[in-house]
C-alpha cells in the first residue's frame, strides 16, 4: 500500500498587503511542497511593527479558499489566523514576506513583516521573516525561502529564535552564498519634511532612514552588499541580561543614602 506523505502546512503573512507581488510569488513557489494559507492586511501596513488593533473590530474578507485579508496590522493577521482561522489545525511554520525592501539593522524594530513572524513565535511556532533588498527579483527570494523550508523538512527549526532573512535583489544564480549575521545599525533618521496640504494646513512627512552607522563585516548590511543572503537569528526577550548587575548596583546607591 502506498504511504501518503502529509504536506507541510505554512501560514504566510506580510505588511505590504494581501495582493502584493512578494507574498503571492512566495505562495506560488512554496505550493509544490506545502499547503499554503495566506492571511495578510487588506492594504499596505509597512512600519506597523508589533501593533495590535484594540479599539475597533477586525474585518476579515475571504478572497479565495485559502486567502483572507484583514483590515488590521500584520500582527492582527497572525493573531487571527492562529487563534481563530487555523486554531484547530495549526500550521507547521510561519513565513512573513516576501517584504518589498530590506529589513536590516534597527529597521527590524519597525517592520511589520518581522512583527508578523514574531507573533507566530510568541504563539509557539517556528517563524521566518524574509525580505528582498529591492523590488525586482522576488523569484530569487522565493527560491531562498524554498531552500530554507526544505532544510526545515530535514531538520525542523526550533521555536527559540525568529530568522530574519534578507536576500540581495539579483538573479538566484548571482547569489554569492549565505551567511549568518548580526544586526547592523543606522544613525538616527533624517529630519522631518515640512509641507502644506491642499487646504493650506501644515503637514509633516517622516524623513528617509538614517545612514548606516554599523555596517562592518559580520553585519547584515555588509553581507547583502556582497551579494550574499543574510540570516539573522532574532530573540524576542529584550532583557539586557549583562546589565542586570550594573543596574542593581546603581539602584543600591540611592537606597544607601
From Swiss-Prot:
Binds 1 divalent metal cation per subunit. Its cofactor is a divalent metal cation. InterPro entries: SurE, SurE-like_Pase/nucleotidase, SurE-like_sf. It comes from the Bacteria. Keywords: Cytoplasm, Hydrolase, Metal-binding, Nucleotide-binding. Gene3D superfamilies: Survival protein SurE-like phosphatase/nucleotidase. Belongs to the SurE nucleotidase family. This is 5'-nucleotidase SurE. The lineage of its organism: Bacteria, Pseudomonadati, Pseudomonadota, Gammaproteobacteria, Vibrionales.
Amino acid at each position: 500500500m502506498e504511504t501518503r506523505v502529509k504536506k507541510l502546512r505554512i501560514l504566510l503573512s506580510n505588511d505590504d498587503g494581501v495582493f502584493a507581488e512578494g507574498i503571492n510569488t512566495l505562495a506560488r513557489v512554496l505550493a509544490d511542497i506545502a499547503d499554503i494559507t495566506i492571511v495578510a492586511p487588506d492594504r499596505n501596513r509597512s512600519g506597523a511593527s508589533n501593533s495590535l488593533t484594540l479599539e475597533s473590530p477586525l474585518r476579515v474578507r475571504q478572497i479565495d479558499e485559502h486567502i483572507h485579508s484583514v483590515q488590521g496590522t500584520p500582527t492582527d493577521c497572525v493573531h487571527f489566523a492562529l487563534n481563530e482561522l487555523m486554531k484547530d489545525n495549526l500550521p507547521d511554520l510561519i513565513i512573513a514576506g516576501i517584504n518589498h525592501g530590506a529589513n536590516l539593522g534597527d529597521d527590524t524594530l519597525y517592520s511589520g513583516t518581522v512583527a508578523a513572524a514574531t507573533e507566530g513565535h510568541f504563539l509557539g511556532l517556528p517563524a521566518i521573516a524574509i525580505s528582498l533588498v529591492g523590488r525586482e527579483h522576488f523569484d530569487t527570494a522565493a527560491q531562498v525561502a524554498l531552500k530554507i523550508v526544505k532544510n526545515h523538512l530535514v531538520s525542523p527549526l526550533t521555536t527559540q529564535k525568529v530568522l530574519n532573512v534578507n536576500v540581495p535583489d539579483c538573479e538566484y544564480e548571482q547569489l554569492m552564498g549565505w551567511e549568518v549575521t548580526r544586526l547592523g545599525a543606522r544613525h538616527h533618521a533624517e529630519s522631518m519634511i515640512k509641507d502644506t496640504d491642499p487646504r493650506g494646513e501644515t503637514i509633516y512627512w517622516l524623513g528617509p532612514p538614517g545612514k548606516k552607522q554599523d555596517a562592518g563585516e559580520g553585519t547584515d548590511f555588509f553581507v547583502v552588499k556582497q551579494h550574499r543572503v543574510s540570516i539573522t537569528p532574532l530573540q524576542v526577550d529584550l532583557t539586557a541580561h549583562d546589565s542586570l548587575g550594573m543596574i542593581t548596583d546603581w539602584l543600591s546607591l540611592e537606597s544607601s543614602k
